[in-house]
């Protein structure tokens, strides 16, 4: 869909070495302009609201000053469900956690439909921090809501 509010109740992973995320993304990252807007949980209570924008000038990471910090109290991201939201309007993107605005990006011209995606991955850059005895360390999704 084009524009809307995307929200989910998520318990993020507790340990580093892998990442859980909620994202809205375009269909084809080879067609510009393209954007992916994400909530990422990287373990140890670190959360990152951010976006990656591609245009004819290249790739631009749009990170908040809160990105990669402990936005919630210790243990909250991995021990309980929290509500993560991304609002997409014709004026830009806004990230929320438990109803509180955390990050905002204005004036990104994207008018193509995007999809909502949840992933749990281990990137090559994360692998050195992965401790196998801490697995399983899943992300859990309680519910998902999408508004136009």
What name fits each language-model region?
Residues 1-148:
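GH16 jelly-roll
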């Amino acid at each position: 869909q084009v524009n809307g509010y995307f929200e989910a109740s998520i318990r993020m992973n507790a340990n580093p070495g892998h990442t859980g995320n909620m994202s809205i993304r375009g269909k084809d990252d080879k067609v510009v302009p393209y954007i992916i807007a994400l909530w990422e949980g990287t373990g140890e209570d670190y959360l990152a609201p951010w976006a990656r924008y591609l245009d004819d000038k290249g790739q631009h990471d749009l990170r908040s000053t809160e990105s990669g910090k402990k936005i919630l109290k210790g243990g909250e991201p991995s021990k309980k469900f929290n509500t993560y939201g991304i609002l997409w309007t014709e004026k830009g993107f806004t990230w929320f956690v438990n109803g509180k605005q955390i990050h905002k990006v204005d004036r990104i011209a994207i008018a193509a439909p995007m999809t909502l995606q949840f992933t749990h991955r281990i990137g090559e850059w994360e692998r050195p921090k992965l401790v196998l005895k801490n697995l399983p360390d899943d992300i859990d999704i309680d519910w998902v809501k999408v508004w136009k």
